[in-house]
UniProtKB/Swiss-Prot annotation:
<comment type="function">
    <text>Catalyzes the transfer of the enolpyruvyl moiety of phosphoenolpyruvate (PEP) to the 5-hydroxyl of shikimate-3-phosphate (S3P) to produce enolpyruvyl shikimate-3-phosphate and inorganic phosphate.</text>
</comment>
<keyword id="KW-0028">Amino-acid biosynthesis</keyword>
<dbReference type="GO" id="GO:0005737">
    <property type="term" value="C:cytoplasm"/>
</dbReference>
<feature type="binding site">
    <location>
        <position position="24"/>
    </location>
    <ligand>
        <name>3-phosphoshikimate</name>
    </ligand>
</feature>
<comment type="subunit">
    <text>Monomer.</text>
</comment>
<feature type="binding site">
    <location>
        <position position="154"/>
    </location>
    <ligand>
        <name>3-phosphoshikimate</name>
    </ligand>
</feature>
<feature type="binding site">
    <location>
        <position position="83"/>
    </location>
    <ligand>
        <name>phosphoenolpyruvate</name>
    </ligand>
</feature>
<dbReference type="Pfam" id="PF00275">
    <property type="entry name" value="EPSP_synthase"/>
</dbReference>
<feature type="binding site">
    <location>
        <position position="19"/>
    </location>
    <ligand>
        <name>phosphoenolpyruvate</name>
    </ligand>
</feature>
<feature type="binding site">
    <location>
        <position position="318"/>
    </location>
    <ligand>
        <name>phosphoenolpyruvate</name>
    </ligand>
</feature>
<feature type="binding site">
    <location>
        <position position="111"/>
    </location>
    <ligand>
        <name>phosphoenolpyruvate</name>
    </ligand>
</feature>
<feature type="binding site">
    <location>
        <position position="385"/>
    </location>
    <ligand>
        <name>phosphoenolpyruvate</name>
    </ligand>
</feature>
<feature type="binding site">
    <location>
        <position position="359"/>
    </location>
    <ligand>
        <name>phosphoenolpyruvate</name>
    </ligand>
</feature>
<dbReference type="GO" id="GO:0003866">
    <property type="term" value="F:3-phosphoshikimate 1-carboxyvinyltransferase activity"/>
</dbReference>
<dbReference type="GO" id="GO:0009423">
    <property type="term" value="P:chorismate biosynthetic process"/>
</dbReference>
<comment type="pathway">
    <text>Metabolic intermediate biosynthesis; chorismate biosynthesis.</text>
</comment>
<feature type="binding site">
    <location>
        <position position="19"/>
    </location>
    <ligand>
        <name>3-phosphoshikimate</name>
    </ligand>
</feature>
Amino acid sequence: MIIRPVDEVRGELNAPPSKSYTHRAYFLALLAEGESTIENPLVCDDTLATIEAIRSFGAGVDGKTVVPPEEPSPGFVYARESGTTARFSTALAGGIGGKTLIDGARRLRERPMDGLVKALKGLGAEVDGFSLPLTVKGPVKSGRVSVDASKSSQFVSGLLLLGAEVGLKVEARNPVSKPYIEMTLRTMEAFGVEFEREGFSFEVYPGVKGTRYKVPGDYSTASFFLAAGALYGKVRVNNLLREDVQADMAFLDALEEFGARVKRGRDYVKVEGGELKAVALDCSDFPDSFPILAVVAAYAEGRSVIRARQLRFKESDRVRAMAVNLSRMGVKVRELEDGLEIEGGRPRGAKVETFNDHRIAMAMSIAALGATGPSIIEDTESVSKSHPGFFDDLRRLLE
C-alpha cells in the first residue's frame, strides 16, 4: 500500500468494539448457566478464533447468541495468531476431564506459555509441552495457585476464568499489563461471577450467569487515530467510555505528556495537536500503545525513551520492528533491551515492513502521513487481526 503525506488530518470516527472485552465475553458465555447475548462484538481474525475455540468446547454460537454446553468438553483448539485465545483455552482446558489439544500459527508457537503451564501443573492438570502445540488434561485437583505473570497478564486472566469454572485462589506474581486483569474482573462481574481480592491475590467462586453483554469501544485501536490528531490536526473518536478500565486509556496521558491537547468526554475523546516535546515513558501496563507512541516520539522535538518490558513477546518483536522501520524513515533510533531511544525530527518516506503485526502496520501508516515523501507499507492485510476496517476509517479522516 502506498501512503502519501497529507497537510492535515481532521474528522470524527466511532471506535470499533474492544477486542479484549469481546474475547472475555465469549469465554464467560461458554461457562455460563443459560444463554448469553454478546452485543456489539468485534469481528476480526482474533475474535473469530475465540468463537471457534468455544465451539470446540461445546458451545453453540449463532451470531451474537451463545448457548453453553451442559459441561465443556475436550477438543481441538486452533488459535490462529491469537495469544488471548490460546492462553484462555489452555487455562479452561484445565477444568475439563479429557485431553484438549491447543495449537496456533507459527509466531504464536514462539510466544510464551510457560508461566501458565507451570500454574496448571501445580493445580494437578497434566500438560504436555511448554509452548504450542500442547495438550492439557484436567480436571485440576487443587484450588490454590501462584502464577508468574511477568511475561503476560493473560496467564492471570486465564486462571481467573478457570476459577469461574471450578473455583480457585489465584496469586499473581510480578504482573505486567495490570489493567487487562481489571478488564477480566469487570467482565466477570457483568456475568455474575463472585470473587474477593487483596491486591493481586484473588479468590474466585464458581458460577457464571448467562447475560446480555454490550462490548465497549476499543481504546487500543482508537489510539492510532487519536495519534493522527496529535500529529497532524484534530480528531474525535466516539464510543469511548470515560468510566472504563482499559489499559490503553493511559495512552491519553502519554499524549498529554508529549504536549498534545486531550479532551475526555463521557463517551468520546478529542485530541488536537500541540508543540510536541520528547518524553520518557514506561508503557509496561499498556504495551499495545508502544508502536504508535514510538511514532509520536519520532515527530516530537528532542530525545524520547519509550519502554515496556514484554514487547519482544508480542505478534512480532515490536522493539526490533519499530527500530527497523523508523530507521528506514531516517529517524535516529537506538534499540534498548526493553524499548527504544528515539531522536525526533521529520521522518522521510520509505518502504517499511509490518512483520505480519497489525499494530506495526497501523503505526507505520500513521507515521507515513507526515513524512517528506510517499511510503510503501508492505503486507497491510495484518490489520484484519484486530480491525479489518482500519484503512476505511483512516480514509474517512483524510476526506
